[in-house]
Amino acid sequence: MPRTYSQELINAVSKANPNYPGVALAKACIQANLPSKYVAVALKVTRMTLYSWFRGKPIRFKNQQLVEVFTDLVESDTAKGLLPAKNTTHAKAYLEEMIGEKI
């Protein structure tokens, strides 16, 4: 079962520059209750890479557009009330529908 985000990460993200795409992604994922394990699979990166983005590290050009679109979709669905995910099953189903394949 995926773990929730640590309070340390939540505090770091809240203090980080929101103009960084990775920080915006982290805020969206935390607010939407999407586990990093599933988000990493959806973005086709490792959890280590995902967490480095969350902390403001640069995102390679080939991934940056995907991250920005993903973040926009999650923020939009949160505003519509489709998120936050109620549990990990809901989060997994949401991401599987988004990417069109099993996680």
Predicted regions and their residues:
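Short, charged recognition helix plus adjacent turn
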Residues: M1-S6, T78-I103
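Recognition helix of helix-turn-helix/homeodomain-like DNA-binding domains
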Residues: V45-I59
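Helix-turn-helix DNA-binding elements, focusing on the entry/boundary residues of the two helices
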Residues: L25, S36, Q64
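Short alpha-helical "recognition helix" segments of helix-turn-helix
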Residues: Y38-A40
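DNA major-groove recognition helix of helix-turn-helix
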Residues: L43, F54-R55, Q65, T71
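A short, Lys/Arg-rich alpha-helix, primarily the initiator
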Residues: P2-A32
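DNA major-groove recognition helix of helix-turn-helix/homeodomain DNA-binding modules
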Residues: F61-K80
